[in-house]
Amino acid sequence: MDRENILKAVKEARSLAKPRNFTQSLDLIINLKELDLSRPENRLKEQVVLPNGRGKEPKIAVIAKGDLAAQAEEMGLTVIRQDELEELGKNKKMAKKIANEHDFFIAQADMMPLVGKTLGPVLGPRGKMPQPVPANANLTPLVERLKKTVLINTRDKPLFHVLVGNEKMSDEELAENIEAILNTVSRKYEKGLYHVKSAYTKLTMGPPAQIEK
């Protein structure tokens, strides 16, 4: 899938979508083929840093106490303290809600054993296990990187869709972001993009435009 075909699909996705009174996101949808996804090694569970950013702020939760929790609060991030974490371990419905509402999790390293017991069963299958950091960490560099990161997680289904930007970004920026996802798929499998059956891109409220191979 070369840049020209990706650009063509991005332009088509724009033209197919009606204008809305909000900024629409652009998604990439990829259908895979000839992969046994009952085998965990064939599943895609990757974080990809998009060269031109997500075009949409991710929701980040920080599991911490003391100074690290205070730093996260100052940054406007969701903070989950130890007592709340223990409560989430008893309330699976609330744990799932937290997991679904947040894109990424960061955890104070010495709290990871408790995270594993309480939120692990919910975050693990979603590919959202927290990134551990020391209690004295500066969260800014990590948060800035996560603001440009998307998560691919096929689980056992031969398709995934992932955010690659928004309609305010240029066609070139969106195409570069799509290439970053395709390169990740290519590196994962020995036969590379052969395993991509089809790929589409679409704006939030628009129909999909196929990326020709």
UniProtKB/Swiss-Prot annotation:
Molecular function as annotated in GO: rRNA binding; structural constituent of ribosome; tRNA binding
Signal sequence interval, chain numbering: none
BP-aspect Gene Ontology terms: regulation of translation; translation
Domain of life the protein comes from: Archaea
UniProt KW keywords: Repressor, Ribonucleoprotein, Ribosomal protein, RNA-binding, rRNA-binding, Translation regulation, tRNA-binding
A single Gene Ontology CC term: large ribosomal subunit
Keyword presence, Protein biosynthesis: no
Listed CDD domains: Ribosomal_L1
Pfam families assigned: Ribosomal_L1 (PF00687)
Keyword field contains S-adenosyl-L-methionine: no
Role description: Probably involved in E site tRNA release. Binds directly to 23S rRNA.
Family: Belongs to the universal ribosomal protein uL1 family.
PANTHER family cross-referenced by the UniProt entry: 54S RIBOSOMAL PROTEIN L1, MITOCHONDRIAL (PTHR36427), LARGE RIBOSOMAL SUBUNIT PROTEIN UL1M (PTHR36427:SF3)
Subunit structure: Part of the 50S ribosomal subunit.
Protein name: Large ribosomal subunit protein uL1
